[in-house]
Amino acid sequence: VLGVGLTALIWGGSFAAMKLVVQGGLSVGALLSLRFTLGGLALGLLAWAFKAKPGSRALLDSLLLGLVLTVIFWLQTDGLRYTTTSKSAFITGLYVVFTPLVSLAVGDRLRPSHGIGALVAALGLFLLVNEPGKPFGGWNFGDTETLLCAVLCGVHISMTAHFSRRSDSWTLAT
C-alpha cells in the first residue's frame, strides 16, 4: 500500500513540477531533451552492465516505441502550458480507456466492461472540463494536446505488448 501511495504521489507531483518548469520559461524541447538524455544514459549504463546485445529487430522496435513516447511527452508537457495540472492528469489517465480501443482497432476483442469504463470516463471528462458559459465549455488547446497524448499512450501500450513478444525487454526500455 505504501508503494502504491508513493507512486501516486510521485506521478501526481510530476504534473505540478512540469507545469512549474514550463511556466518558468524552459522550453518543452529543452526540458524533454534533458529528461530523455538523463534517462537514456541511465538505462544505457544498466544495459551495458548487463551486457545486453540487441538485434536489429529489437533496435527498430525500441526506436518506434521511443518516437511514440517522445510525442506523448511533448504533447503532455506542452499541454500543461494551456491547461490545469488536474485536468492534464485526469485526461492523461484516460489512456486506460484508449488502450482497449486501440487493441480493438488492431483486431482484439473487448469485454462489455471496457465499454462501460469508456462511458464512465467520458462522463468524468465532461464533468471535469465543462465550464458553462465559456466557449466550447472551457475546453482548450492544452486539453486537446493532452487528449492526443492519452490516445498515443494507448497506442504505446499496445505496441509494447506486441513488441515484447519478440524483442528483449532491455532493448525496448533503452
List the predicted regions and their residue ranges:
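C-terminal ends of transmembrane helices
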Residues: A42-P54, F98-L110, I157-R166
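Small-residue-rich packing faces within the transmembrane alpha-helices of Major Facilitator Superfamily
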Residues: G12-G13, T37-L41, V97-F98, A122-L123, ...
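Glycine-/small-residue-enriched transmembrane alpha-helix faces in small-molecule transporters
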Residues: V1-S33, L67, V71, L75, ...
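Specific transmembrane alpha-helical segments of multi-pass solute transporters/efflux pumps
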Residues: I10, S14-F15, G44-T92, T99, ...
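Hydrophobic/aromatic residues within transmembrane alpha-helices
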Residues: V21, L31, R35, G79, ...
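Hydrophobic transmembrane alpha-helices of multi-pass small-molecule transport proteins
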Residues: L43, L63, L69, L110-E131, ...
